[in-house]
Amino acid sequence: MKTKCLILAVALTVIFCISSGRRVKAGNPPTSASSPAGTATVRGEVKFVGIAPKPTPINMAADPSCAKQHSTPALNEDVVADAKGALQNVVVFVADGLGDRTFDPPTQPAVIEQKGCVYQPHVLALQANQRLEVVNDDPTSHSVHATPVSNREWNKAEPPGTRVDEAFAREEVAIPVKCNVHPWMRSYVAVFKHPYFVVTGTDGSFDLRNLPPGTYTIEAWHEKLGTATQKTTVGANETKAIHFVFKPTSGS
């Protein structure tokens, strides 16, 4: 009888250990860029107050192969706002509040295309060590030249139909990217150590999702109009709305 009880006790112990092991394996994965664990959201709009400057046409006469790709002149994108003031090409991001959390970069690359001798998109944001592909869809050659302050500078010739594959290791807002062949070509790349960033589109809106609950400094960056910051506290499963307003500057 004692022998049977001992065998039963050992068997129950083994079953419990196996079951416990399975529960551990089914736990939540580590927080990463591909699977942020938070449930909070900060959203809002970026507005331009005042009379927005009219986009000026780009003079592409220096390279006829560029100009002939446009039925109407391409326009500068340094300040783009609609009639209601919705401001495009603003990088909105968490500037402070994430503590020592770490995030893996996405496996998919961020892409800039060169079409009609214009960088598309004009402003791009990605994570540190995420691959950046710069694709040349033009029939003419380009020279892609990134001029960062905190990262490694690079300058690469790019014949038609080729691509440049690079990455930035450090956080930096924002890195100018130009073409040494076509001086009107300019783009900006913002680099972050976390996935909580967005570039505003035509409606000027932003949506920072999957944030851990906490108090954050949210910053908005624009290439001509400068920066603005706001602090907000958001709880689990909560959505907070904030808004940024930019005004004309002497250089805009």
Features from the language model and the residues they span:
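Bacterial N-terminal signal peptides
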Residues: A9-C17
